């Protein structure tokens, strides 16, 4: 976010997943239409057949009322690697409806593309034949009373396919407005079916850079990478710094 208060999306590269080797000075993606004039934020990237699909939150304000919508675009993986920012058409799956925290599964399930997103207060699922028109919106799970995720929830990074099912990292917010991360395991063939869900968060704000900042008491993730038997979770600390946490896969699989 710049001094003008508008969110834009940048690019940074790491060879080992921890140290930043390169960070571009200018944005690689920024608002170019009315529905996102106040920002493009919370990008989530999914690679499908040599195409990188990016969901993000398109933000605008009308008469002091904030409208956030999920938006979708894509870029060829070869262009992304070459830093040719030839983004394709920007699509609003649910135009005019407040919605956010969207992420696409990395392959078709039952011949359909699948996306998680949040219609308040639940984390929902929806389907598409061609990544443009989405339908069959259904709730998968919602906040839990008197829990670390009691106020609201939302998807984090791209679901990870394991033999056991789809491992999905998500954020949950407590009544005290503390943002933490948890995990849920969804069935491989029917991702509307929950196999297990973590009772406690896997990551919560404890460090100074997570407790104090632009928005205090926040760990918020939009991306994760599986490297062999480890998962690197990239997250924002207090909406001010970029962080990474490393986990063994077996640490993340919630008990039934």
Go through each PLM region and give its residues:
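Beta-rich carbohydrate-recognition and catalytic domains
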Residues: 1-38, 47-151, 160-214, 228-256
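Structural signature of WD-repeat beta-propeller blades
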Residues: 41, 102, 157, 220-222
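Electrostatic interaction modules used in gene-expression and signaling proteins
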Residues: 224-226
């Amino acid at each position: 976010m710049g001094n003008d208060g508008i969110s834009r999306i940048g690019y940074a590269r790491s060879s080992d997943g921890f140290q930043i080797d390169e960070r571009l000075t200018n944005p690689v993606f920024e608002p170019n239409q009315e529905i996102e004039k106040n920002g493009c934020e919370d990008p989530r990237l999914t690679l499908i057949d040599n195409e990188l699909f990016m969901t993000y939150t398109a933000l605008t304000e009308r008469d002091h009322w904030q409208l956030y919508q999920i938006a979708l675009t894509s870029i060829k993986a070869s262009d992304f690697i070459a830093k040719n920012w030839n983004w394709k058409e920007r699509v609003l799956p649910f135009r005019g409806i407040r919605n956010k925290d969207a992420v696409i599964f990395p392959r078709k399930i039952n011949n359909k593309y699948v996306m998680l997103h949040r219609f308040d207060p639940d984390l929902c699922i929806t389907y598409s034949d061609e990544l443009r028109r989405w339908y069959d919106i259904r709730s998968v799970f919602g906040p839990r009373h008197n829990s670390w995720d009691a106020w609201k929830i939302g998807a984090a990074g791209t679901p990870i396919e394991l033999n056991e099912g789809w491992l999905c990292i998500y954020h949950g917010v407590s009544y005290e407005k503390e943002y933490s991360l948890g995990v849920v395991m969804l069935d491989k063939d029917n991702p509307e079916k929950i196999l297990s869900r973590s009772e406690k968060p896997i990551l919560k704000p404890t460090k100074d850079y997570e407790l104090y900042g632009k928005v205090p008491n926040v760990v918020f993730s939009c991306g994760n990478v599986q490297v062999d038997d480890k998962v690197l979770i990239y997250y924002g600390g207090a909406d001010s710094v970029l962080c990474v946490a490393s986990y063994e896969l077996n640490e993340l699989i919630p008990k039934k």
